[in-house]
Amino acid sequence: MKKYSLILIFISIVIGVSFLPNVYGQDDISKAITKKNANPIVYHLTSNDPWRASIVISDATNLKNLGYNVTLLLSIEGVQVGVKNPHHHLNLDNVVANVTNFIKDGGKVVVCGVCLEVAGFEPNDIIEGAIIGTAEITPKLFTNATVVTY
């Protein structure tokens, strides 16, 4: 009988403790503060490969939608996904549409100006809402930033 009483007490304690609030969890307010104060994230895309570019844009969009400060930096061959009409043989129309949507939804896109010129494009060829990276703008992107390069 004593055994059953101890088991019953133990089960009662376990059930009772399970209803206590988790002091290690985050509520919505603390999650929002964490994201707001988090370091900025820069996705640096150097490739015009549609698969690689799609992954970058998907990741950047998901983090932006979660509230993080995300910038997409396009350089070298990656500038192709930041222009209105990339070279047709690259088949980047869907990727360019996703970058356009990223910008429309509040994402920031910076296109390397030198890389743009080397690729044969003019500043007015970039997607609406994107900006040309300059010596003043680009270094500021990296201040306290987490950089993910593809």
Placement of each model-derived feature along the sequence:
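Secreted/extracellular ectodomain signature
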Residues: V23-P40, L45-Y150
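Bacterial N-terminal signal peptides
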Residues: L8-S18
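Positively charged n-region of N-terminal signal peptides that target proteins for export
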Residues: M1-Y4
